[in-house]
Amino acid sequence: MTDLTAEAAISPSDDILLPALASLREGHPDKGILKLLAQLKIDHPEWAVSEKRFRKALQLAPCPGGGEADPKEKALVADTGLDPSIDVKSIAPKVEVKMFAGGKGKGLVAKEELKQGEMLWQEEPWIVTSDPGHYSLLTQSMMCSQCFSLFARPSPPLSVPCPHCTTAHFCNRLCYTKSLSSSHPPLLCPGLNPDASSLMNFIRKRGERSVEGVAKILARWRGEREWDAKGKAEEMEKRIWKGMARVSQKRKEMERREWSYISKARMEEWHLIHIMLTNVLNPSPTHENYKPFQRLLISQHPRRSKPVPLTEKEVKRWFSFESFLELLGLVGLNQEDSGGLYALHAHMNHSCEPNIQVRNLPKSYTPPTQDTLPVNLPPPIQAGDRVSNKLTILARHEIQPGEELTISYVNMKMSRDERRQALREGYGFWCACDRCMREKEQPNGEKAE
């Protein structure tokens, strides 16, 4: 039988499609790309629009407020959503999560008036990744592998070494316990999973911090799936695949002008890393690490139960090459330099004139009380200050209720062109904040004072 719907379907011109996509995005700010495409098919069943064209057109659709995206400056639209596992009210009572229209995704806004210097919340990373500059300190037991606190001397009294390997050392028992899910999971401990040694050595030799983040995400999910209550693995799945902003690393790098020259080498490199990760965290029955890995899963299980094989759906979701590229892009978008991945911090969007300051403050820092506000922001860190990877979120100046909380993803002292290029290469978008618009007419994107 002839499909009359398909026969009658038309391909709308950009003049018709782009305004429709702008309205669609405005009306459904909480939906990702695929759900928006499904909604478009519901609203306009007479149209024939492929996913490839839809993605490209969405980048060129008119922006909120009447402005239009520059066709020469199309942005990558990240898949994102809300993370139901974060109890924002208890972490940051004066802050709430908001879904913005126009493909911007989620962000944070003030619920109440905030004063200069006010501490909004403090947060530890849920996935810890180390700066390459810390490697020598970590391998010499001069720094805690969990919180990055410096030791006065190697392996000081009361500190806790990993009981299974020599590659991790901790301030105390608390940091060691936290590390089992965030910085030194059993599945990546060389003493428990010998194949992890070559992977971690590769990461540190190459300074592949984003790969470290992917490895620890996979190790945490696999551990929670095997050993903990099922709810934790499901909670993490929602955070990763529905809550955090992500763009495939391949899609991101395909936008680079030199992609045609580097694509072959990059694809080969990614395939190699993917194979290494799979052999360490999901070895096939024919791989030499399969039986040792199965024994490890059994030994760490509270009841020494035999592991249940991953389903085909789980393998595709977590260990396929496409998922690896998605996770690599996710870590690149959300990773904070001082410690790794932070759940609530990852909600904040960029501005070249941010109203929020993110700091690693001394452990002696005491937040100001309400009756002492407003106050100046804390002074720079001094030599000898004991700091960690805990983030302290501060208001740079007075912030009104409903105002979005923003941070700068790049060095604010760079020129407009330098900032925008860094944001495009690192995060997939061309900044159009108020400062960038003001400086647009200034020759050479004048640098900030």
Swiss-Prot record:
It is an enzyme of class 2 (transferase). The keyword Methyltransferase applies. One of its GO terms (molecular function) is histone H4K20 methyltransferase activity. Residues 93-410 form the SET domain. Its EC number is 2.1.1.-. It is found in: Nucleus; Chromosome; Cytoplasm. One of its GO terms (cellular component) is nucleus. Its main location: nucleus. GO terms for biological process: methylation; negative regulation of gene expression, epigenetic. Pfam families: SET. PROSITE patterns: SET. CDD domains: SET_SMYD (cd20071). Keywords: Chromosome, Cytoplasm, Methyltransferase, Nucleus, S-adenosyl-L-methionine, Transferase. SUPFAM superfamilies: SET domain (SSF82199). Histone methyltransferase that monomethylates 'Lys-5', 'Lys-8' and 'Lys-12' of histone H4 (H4K5me1, H4K8me1 and H4K12me1, respectively), thereby controlling gene expression and remodeling chromatin structures. Belongs to the class V-like SAM-binding methyltransferase superfamily. Histone-lysine methyltransferase family. SET5 subfamily. This is Histone-lysine N-methyltransferase SET5. It comes from Cryptococcus neoformans var. neoformans serotype D (strain JEC21 / ATCC MYA-565).
